[in-house]
């Protein structure tokens, strides 16, 4: 259980401090909690989409493409918005094309530029799996008020911005 694991983390941080380790307990707890909850939510997401037959990364790229105007995009856009390398986007889109979930064609304006489009089968898969997956995942947030959810989102945005500033992280594409 996550609550048991979080308690063990708190106990471990206190024990490390008692042994003389100079670590800010609150920062250590925030860091470890984010990691633990993030992994657990990722596992829940994997389980929710498993019946679709897609891996989480494939499903996320399909959803990202579906969420674009007219379900059309380019590999570079998918790369920038998904934190995947160009090579991984290529592999993922190859898989989605092979399964008939998206189509790939060359741009009429620039034959070197690929156009990716969600196919009817991809739209059907999304319409079939997304509502139930998000209902399942949504139960995690049901105990939070609308105000608490908005605050959590704002705080996560702040953490993401601080991370970007700290690392200078730019998309690989």
Question: What is the predicted role of each segment?
Answer:
Residues 1-22, 147-173:
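C-terminal regulatory/oligomerization modules of transcriptional regulators
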Residues 1-52:
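N-terminal leader segment of winged-helix/HTH proteins
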Residues 31, 35, 39, 83, ...:
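Short amphipathic alpha-helical segments with heptad-repeat character
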Residues 25, 35, 39-85, 167, ...:
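N-terminal helix-turn-helix DNA-binding core of bacterial DNA-binding proteins
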Residues 94-154:
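Charged, amphipathic alpha-helical coiled-coil/dimerization segments
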Residues 41, 82, 125, 129-144, ...:
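Alpha-helical linker/hinge and terminal dimerization helices associated
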Residues 23-26, 54-56, 118, 144:
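Alpha-helical hairpin
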């Amino acid at each position: 259980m996550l609550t048991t694991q979080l308690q063990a983390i708190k106990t471990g941080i206190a024990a490390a401090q008692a042994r003389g380790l100079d670590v800010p307990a609150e920062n250590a707890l925030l860091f470890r909690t984010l990691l633990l909850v993030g992994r657990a939510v990722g596992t829940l997401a994997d389980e929710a989409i498993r019946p679709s037959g897609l891996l989480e990364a494939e499903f996320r790229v399909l959803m990202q493409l579906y969420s674009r105007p007219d379900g059309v995009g380019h590999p570079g856009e998918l790369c920038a918005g998904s934190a995947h390398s160009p090579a991984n986007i290529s592999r993922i889109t190859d898989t989605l094309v092979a399964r008939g979930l998206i189509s790939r064609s060359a741009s009429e304006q620039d034959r070197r530029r690929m156009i990716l489009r969600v196919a009817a089968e991809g739209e059907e898969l999304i319409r079939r799996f997304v509502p139930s997956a998000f209902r399942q995942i949504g139960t995690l947030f049901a105990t939070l008020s609308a105000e608490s959810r908005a605050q959590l989102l704002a705080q996560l945005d702040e953490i993401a911005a601080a991370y970007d500033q700290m690392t200078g992280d730019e998309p690989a594409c």
